[in-house]
A protein has these predicted regions:
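Short amphipathic alpha-helix that is part of the acyltransferase structural core
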Residues: 1-39, 46, 50-58, 141, ...
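Conserved active-site tyrosine of GNAT-family acetyltransferases
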Residues: 21, 114-116, 120
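Short beta-strand micro-motifs in enzyme catalytic cores
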Residues: 43-47, 70, 133-137
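Conserved beta-strand in the GNAT
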Residues: 48, 54-73
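A short, internal acetyl-CoA/4′-phosphopantetheine-binding micro-motif in the GNAT/acyltransferase core
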Residues: 72-80
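Conserved acetyl-CoA-binding loop-helix of GNAT-fold acetyltransferases
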Residues: 80-93
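Conserved GNAT acetyl-CoA-binding A-motif
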Residues: 95-108
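Conserved catalytic-core motifs of GNAT/GCN5-like acyltransferases
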Residues: 106, 121-138
Length: 153
């Protein structure tokens, strides 16, 4: 399977981004709609992944100007650590281009081991958000600049 990853503005790609996030976050994770679709989407840099054969959206992610990475969603039939790593690589590259000092995200506890392979470190206390135990994880941009991420596919 081949796919394309693009940076997209919310204004042009909102229906495609929303379709993935609705299926993953609202239907599967039972995140309330008003939590999933906040007022930060317009200011974020968004990633959209589409299946090259069907042209359908299959994954999303976003980074805010303050360095917060969030809304990483991959449709169930397309889930693989490889795809999530590629989404993260594009988001981290965007962070470098935004000249951020660090990035952070509020990860589910079960995902922290995976994100540690992307140079993230857990900080602070565990808390509940939308019924999921989470913890803040951070990554200094210097470690991203020195990491070797391949964006080929």
């Amino acid at each position: 399977m081949s796919y394309s990853i693009c940076l997209v503005p919310w204004e042009q790609a909102a229906p495609l981004l929303m379709s993935v996030r609705e299926k993953v976050s609202i239907c599967e994770r039972r995140t309330p709609r008003k939590v999933e679709f906040d007022n930060k989407d317009k200011e974020a840099v968004h990633i959209l992944v589409c299946d090259d054969d069907t042209k359908e959206p299959i994954a999303t992610g976003r980074i805010l100007p303050n360095g917060e990475i969030s809304r990483i969603s991959v449709l169930k039939p397309y889930r693989s650590l490889d795809l999530v790593k590629r989404v993260m690589a594009v988001l981290l590259k965007a962070a470098v281009e935004l000249k951020l000092d660090k990035v952070y995200m509020y990860s589910s506890l079960s995902s922290i081991p995976f994100f540690s392979t992307c140079h993230f470190t857990a900080v602070g206390s565990v808390f509940m958000k939308s019924g999921i135990p989470r913890q803040c994880i951070t990554c200094p941009i210097d470690s991203i600049k020195h990491a070797h991420y391949q964006l080929t596919h």
